[in-house]
């Protein structure tokens, strides 16, 4: 039975082994010594926590003992912990003799900030993966937090040579471009499985779904992400479709298969049970995605893991249907989507899943469960909420990250220290420093609809029609005795200009102009000038009146002339009024006479009027 299971399983996954696997890479920049300075490619390990979206600078150390890191460094009295003021330590380790993950764990225990595994032979880079469940208890896997990278044998030998020559090797690991970040939305997919009896990997996967659900739903509801779950299936070779093994692991006559959960056909659930539950989860997503609520999928799969485990013999349709109903999902639509697993026909949902397994563009074939793909790049690292969220947040275009990406757990707010080296106006509490997931940006801000312009580092200035509303446009402003003057003008001009009655740069100061002292106003012989803040007062002696527009004093003679002029003006106005009334009276009289004549003419056609003589004319007819 075990041999038959092994043979069939081998045939089922043979097509995947022949698939196109893409090694996810990041850059490694050697900054010293000059002999090996340059940028190199390295492969990201599929464990630990790669610093997606960030960089890590350190000094390389090649231990004199335990160079393959298969034993604890404490046995050799070796520590890689950095001393205060020094760069973190990158440990160079040789490949071979033990698992990659064990090397990383041992180096981390000794204080390493990252490990570089030098390949033992000249070959293309490969992905360092976690060991199979049956080959290692791997209790330490989830505790690995340092990043790891596989480098070529050539680069490894060059680093060793430089270190043996007494050179200090410094380098920078760069993950800023490991995940594409084209726009403000991240598209990601999770290749998962409903099977909960596959050991530690299944336990880790279920734990991740539970922990990540909240963040995933926040991002999806906010329109920040587009999530799609996927499920790996295999087809049974045609020669084996009628075999007992194929019938127990496949549905739809061998088209869609999954391995037996317990690796034993005689007990527990079969592989076909897993395929059906995977299909049900995929259909739940499709139904809810059509209703505009794709995030309900997370509620369903986490509830299913809790309420319908294989260990309690609840991994059934009845248990699943109960959850579907409790979440308000249309059960009929889900059942229609699932179709008949016994029918000799293709299932459109699972057929699409098999086609999606094949890599496109920069994404390789999906061959590992679970697999996370972010912006069409396969994620490498620990399947843990913080690590995955870090990778996803690196997929947003700079300055478009949602708030969840800017928490202290995920990134360091560089604006908190020295304002990130950017411009700021402490009085108005305005800064050009913008915290992003990849680091700070110095960009002049827009505040209350007012755009600031400048380089963002040394200066930013409010501009536009409303710029005076923000810190007075950066211009001078002062109030005294109930009067306020400002050098800011609410138009599209950018310059500060002292108002009339002041002089200065308009930015830091505007000083009152003493018009009296400068003799620019109030200069007539009878004038008496008194300077005020922002203006002046001018009075006249001997009871004269001051005319500001002419800067002169008017005496009594001039007043008499003025009175005469006003008298003439009134006479003229009265004369015009009388002429107007007379004209109106004549007009009314003529109109009335004209109307009387017209009316009399009309009436005369019908009857004799007293003032009209008899009509003596007539018509005669001879008889």
UniProtKB/Swiss-Prot annotation:
Q: Start and end of every PA domain?
A: 51-163
GO terms classed as biological process: Golgi to vacuole transport; protein targeting to vacuole; vacuolar transport
Which parts of the chain does the record assign to the membrane side Lumenal? 23-565
Q: Which keywords, in A-to-Z order, does the entry hold?
A: Calcium, Cytoplasmic vesicle, Disulfide bond, EGF-like domain, Glycoprotein, Golgi apparatus, Membrane, Protein transport, Repeat, Signal, Transmembrane, Transmembrane helix, Transport
The induction annotation reads: Slightly induced by water deficit.
Report the residue ranges where the short sequence motif Tyrosine-based internalization motif is annotated in this entry.
Answer: 606-609
Q: Which GO terms describe its cellular component?
A: clathrin-coated vesicle membrane; cytosol; endoplasmic reticulum; Golgi apparatus; Golgi membrane; late endosome; plasma membrane; trans-Golgi network
Q: Where does the EGF-like domain start and stop, copy by copy?
A: 411-461, 464-511, 512-554
Q: Which cysteines are joined by disulfide bonds?
A: 415-433, 422-442, 444-460, 468-488, 475-496, 498-510, 540-553
Signal sequence interval, chain numbering = 1-22
**Subunit field text:** Interacts with the N-terminal propeptide of ALEU and the C-terminal part of the 12S globulin CRA1 in a calcium-dependent manner. Binds to EPSIN1.
Q: State the name under which the record lists this protein.
A: Vacuolar-sorting receptor 1
Species this protein is from: Arabidopsis thaliana
């Amino acid at each position: 039975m075990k041999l038959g299971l092994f043979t069939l399983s081998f045939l089922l996954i043979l097509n995947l082994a022949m698939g196109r696997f893409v090694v996810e890479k990041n850059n490694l920049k050697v900054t010293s010594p000059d002999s090996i300075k340059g940028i190199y490619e390295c492969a990201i390990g599929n464990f630990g926590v790669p610093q997606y979206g960030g960089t890590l600078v350190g000094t390389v150390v090649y231990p004199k003992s335990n160079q393959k890191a298969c034993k604890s460094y404490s046995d050799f009295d070796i520590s890689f912990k950095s001393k205060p003021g020094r760069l973190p330590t990158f440990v160079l380790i040789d490949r071979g003799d033990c698992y990659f993950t064990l090397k990383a764990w041992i180096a981390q225990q000794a204080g390493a900030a990252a490990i570089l595994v030098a390949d033992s032979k000249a070959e293309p880079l490969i992905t360092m993966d976690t060991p199979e469940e049956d080959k290692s208890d791997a209790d330490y896997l989830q505790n690995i937090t340092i990043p790891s990278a596989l480098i070529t044998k050539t680069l490894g030998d060059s680093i060793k040579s430089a270190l043996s020559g007494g050179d200090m090797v410094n380098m920078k690991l760069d993950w800023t471009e490991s995940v594409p970040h084209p726009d403000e939305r991240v598209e990601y997919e999770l290749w998962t499985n409903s099977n909960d009896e596959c050991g530690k990997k299944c336990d880790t996967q279920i734990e991740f779904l539970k922990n990540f659900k909240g963040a995933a739903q926040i991002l999806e509801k906010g329109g920040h992400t587009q999530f799609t779950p996927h499920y790996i299936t295999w087809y049974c070779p045609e020669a084996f479709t009628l075999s007992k093994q194929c019938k127990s692991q496949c549905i739809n006559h061998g088209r869609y298969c999954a391995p037996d959960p317990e690796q034993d056909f005689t007990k527990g659930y079969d592989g076909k049970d897993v395929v059906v539950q995977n299909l049900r989860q995929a259909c739940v997503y499709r139904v809810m995605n059509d209703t505009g609520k794709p995030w309900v999928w997370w509620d369903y799969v986490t509830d299913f893991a809790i309420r319908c485990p294989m260990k309690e013999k609840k991994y059934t349709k009845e248990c699943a249907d109960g959850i579907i109903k409790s979440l308000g999902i249309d059960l009929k639509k889900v059942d229609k989507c699932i179709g008949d697993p016994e029918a000799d026909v293709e299932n459109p949902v699972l057929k699409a899943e098999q086609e999606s397994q094949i890599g496109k563009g920069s994404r390789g074939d999906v061959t590992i469960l679970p697999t996370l793909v972010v912006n069409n790049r396969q994620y490498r690292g620990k399947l843990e909420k913080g690590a995955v969220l870090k990778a996803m947040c690196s997929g947003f275009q700079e300055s478009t990250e949602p708030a969840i990406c800017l928490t202290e757990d995920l990134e360091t707010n560089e604006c908190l220290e020295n304002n990130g080296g950017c411009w700021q106006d402490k009085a108005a509490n305005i800064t050009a420093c913008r915290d992003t997931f990849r680091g700070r940006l110095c960009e002049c801000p827009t505040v209350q609809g007012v755009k600031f312009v400048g380089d963002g580092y040394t200066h930013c200035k409010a501009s536009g029609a409303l710029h005076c509303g923000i810190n007075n446009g950066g211009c001078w402003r002062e109030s005294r005795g109930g009067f306020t003057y400002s050098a800011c003008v609410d138009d599209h001009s950018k310059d500060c200009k002292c108002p009339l009655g002041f002089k200065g740069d308009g930015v830091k100061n505007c000083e009152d102009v003493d018009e009296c002292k400068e003799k620019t106003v109030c200069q007539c012989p009878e004038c008496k000038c008194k300077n005020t803040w922002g203006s002046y007062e001018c009075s006249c002696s001997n009871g004269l009146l001051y005319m500001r527009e002419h800067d002169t004093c008017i005496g009594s003679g001039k007043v008499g002339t003025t009175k005469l002029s006003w008298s003439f003006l009134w006479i003229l106005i009265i004369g015009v009024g009388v002429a107007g009334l007379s004209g109106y009276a004549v007009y009314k009289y003529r109109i009335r006479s004209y109307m009387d004549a017209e009316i009399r003419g009309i009436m005369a056609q019908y009857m004799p009027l007293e003032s009209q003589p008899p009509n003596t004319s007539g018509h005669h007819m001879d008889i």
